[in-house]
Amino acid sequence: MSTIAGESSSSSKMPENSQPTTTEKGSEYLEQLANEAEELRKKLDQERHKLNDIPIQQAAERLDVMGALGVKQRRILKGHVGKVLCMDWSLDKRHIVSSSQDGKVIVWDGFTTNKEHALTMPTTWVMACAFSPSSQMIACGGLDNKCSVVPLSFEDDIIQKKRQVATHTSYMSCCTFLRSDNLILTGSGDSTCAIWDVESGQLIQNFHGHTGDVFAIDVPKCDTGNTFISAGADKHSLVWDIRSGQCVQSFEGHEADINTVRFHPNGDAFATGSDDATCRLFDLRADRQVCVYEKESILFPVNGVDFSLSGRILFAGYGDYRVGVWDSLKCARHSVLYGHENRISCLRTSPDGTAVCSASWDCTIRIWA
């Protein structure tokens, strides 16, 4: 019995020169990859630093301080009975489309404040809306996971001509037309962006890269249409090549969800707004963040940003009901616009730069000029 027990005891011992398990090999490999990634990150930061020859505030020291703008509230558009979630200007510089938590999409005459069209969508929380370049149709969508396109006409019942052109696997958070009325770009809570053919409803290109919900997209005004930018809950802003479907640049810096993104008029930079109560300016050529627009007294999220026509002014809509006016080059706040009675959800400058429009949870859209 003792001999058998001794053999059993010796056989239960592991050999001293045992080989690493598959799990151990995998852990070592992952650690090696993490170290390589960290080294590459350091090299990338060094290359970015070489391009950052001078801080933007220092470069702007010789510029004169901006004088009084004289911007005031000129129009209030009332008609929604729920939180206004999104708005967009028509390229005719006169009409505005808005979408709301009440399930309504309204097309307004910004001069007269009259409602020209009102549509009831099959879902509440219509989170996105956009005018086509021709101003002859609008796109909208939200919690129904779909993007619908509606031709605008005074002769027919336009809701009968509504057609579905896109379907995501989660809510649609943003949309915009690309170059013409034929292509539409959407962003979704399913972490993807996609380009769709308006006529056929076919998916043309899918963009995978975000690790969280996509909240905002934008296309540069001066570009030929080969890039766009997206941002969202993963705190990253990604620049995409439309032709290849690949992410070509990634920017980080925010400490919370990014709610809004907007290209600078020259197309070489973009601004973001976040739940961390800051706006940030990123330079595509320098491949880095170049400015943070913040104040200790600002504690509320930024839900909408846009530039003036020259790019010198950055408008930002906050959760504290105010519109902040920033000098984008001196990185200093110039003034504040008061009027809304609830958080601002969206903000856009008119195509000719003569006005700014803000949408709010107070059920109104306001035009400032």
UniProtKB/Swiss-Prot annotation:
| InterPro entries in UniProt | G-protein_beta_WD-40_rep (IPR020472), Gprotein_B (IPR001632), Guanine_nucleotide-bd_bsu (IPR016346), WD40/YVTN_repeat-like_dom_sf (IPR015943), WD40_repeat_CS (IPR019775), WD40_repeat_dom_sf (IPR036322), WD40_rpt (IPR001680)
**Annotated WD repeat ranges:** 79-109, 121-151, 167-197, 209-241, 253-283, 297-327, 339-369
Q: Name one Pfam family in it.
A: WD40_Gbeta
Q: Which UniProt keywords apply?
A: Repeat, Transducer, WD repeat
Q: Which GO terms describe its cellular component?
A: cytoplasm; heterotrimeric G-protein complex; neuronal cell body; synapse
Which gene name does the record give? gpb-2
MF-aspect GO terms: signaling receptor complex adaptor activity
The Gene Ontology biological process terms listed for this entry are:
feeding behavior; G protein-coupled acetylcholine receptor signaling pathway; G protein-coupled dopamine receptor signaling pathway; negative regulation of gene expression; regulation of egg-laying behavior; regulation of G protein-coupled receptor signaling pathway; regulation of locomotion; regulation of nematode pharyngeal pumping
Indicate yes or no for the key word RNA-binding.
no
Assembly information from the UniProt record: G proteins are composed of 3 units, alpha, beta and gamma. Interacts with G protein gamma subunits gpc-1 and gpc-2 and with egl-10 and eat-16.
Protein name listed in UniProt: Guanine nucleotide-binding protein subunit beta-2
Q: What CDD domains is this protein classified in?
A: WD40 (cd00200)
Positions of the UniProt region annotated as Disordered: 1-28
| Similarity comment | Belongs to the WD repeat G protein beta family.
Q: What's its job? A: Guanine nucleotide-binding proteins (G proteins) are involved as a modulator or transducer in various transmembrane signaling systems. The beta and gamma chains are required for the GTPase activity, for replacement of GDP by GTP, and for G protein-effector interaction. Plays a role in regulating dopamine-mediated locomotion behavior.
Q: Which residue windows does the record flag with biased composition (Polar residues)?
A: 1-24
